[in-house]
Amino acid sequence: MSAAFTISKKRKFVADGVFYAELNEFFTRELSEEGYSGCEVRVTPSRSEIIIRATHTQDVLGEKGRRIRELTALVQKRFKFAENTVELYAEKVQNRGLCAVAQCESLRYKLLAGLAVRRAAYGVLRYVMEAGAKGCEVVISGKLRAARAKSMKFADGFMIHSGQPAVDFIDSATRHVLLRQGVLGVKVKIMLPEPKTRQKKSLPDIVVVLDPKEEEPITKPYTVINQPVEAAAAAGQEVVAEQETAVAY
């Protein structure tokens, strides 16, 4: 986010966080039908690059790039960027089954289409587990059948809920679905096979057993006699004398 005046590091972090939250909310509202699943902001000295991750990148770009240009103009006007200092790019989600936002949006549209709650939830669970996830949890709450609200939880596989591994390995998303009987809350949590960060981390309960080193062959023990320097010199002279005698013969 560009600023003409210098601010402290603390205020800079807060301003960047607010900017990212507002930008993410804006894209969530504008690109919900295109399968929006997150964005990444890269700031360079000359311009700011915003990478939009979605399942349908062609719809994000639009015909001849019209939609992406409209979004660029809206972002530039909303966040007061200077002219030609912000660019938007569309990136396709590599694995939809391991993206909680994409699966949450998929479940949302299934419920809007009138699909049964259990069938929609189990379809998401099956798709996520087939994609290679360690575990998945789907929670749907609201007026599901009767007039009284309740919550239904569907889970499969392995799921952790606390500690630093929950931050590194859990991808979660929450959406709201407006139906005729009221608003439903949808939450999807996915236990990833690898951490979200690029650092190689493992769960604390995983024990890695290293292969044993190859044993060196045991040699026969021997004794080393340390002789004094004078005795060693005399022994050396005797050996030389014996060699000279042998040569003379």
UniProtKB/Swiss-Prot annotation:
GO terms for cellular component: cytosol; cytosolic small ribosomal subunit; nucleus. PROSITE patterns: KH_TYPE_2, RIBOSOMAL_S3. One of its GO terms (biological process) is cytoplasmic translation. Gene3D superfamilies: 3.30.300.20, Ribosomal protein S3, C-terminal domain (3.30.1140.32). One of its GO terms (molecular function) is structural constituent of ribosome. Pfam families: KH_2, Ribosomal_S3_C. It is found in: Cytoplasm. The modification Phosphoserine is found at residues 32, 37, 106, 141. Keywords: Cytoplasm, Phosphoprotein, Ribonucleoprotein, Ribosomal protein, RNA-binding. Component of the ribosome, a large ribonucleoprotein complex responsible for the synthesis of proteins in the cell. The small ribosomal subunit (SSU) binds messenger RNAs (mRNAs) and translates the encoded message by selecting cognate aminoacyl-transfer RNA (tRNA) molecules. The large subunit (LSU) contains the ribosomal catalytic site termed the peptidyl transferase center (PTC), which catalyzes the formation of peptide bonds, thereby polymerizing the amino acids delivered by tRNAs into a polypeptide chain. Belongs to the universal ribosomal protein uS3 family. This is Small ribosomal subunit protein uS3. It comes from Schizosaccharomyces pombe (strain 972 / ATCC 24843) (Fission yeast).
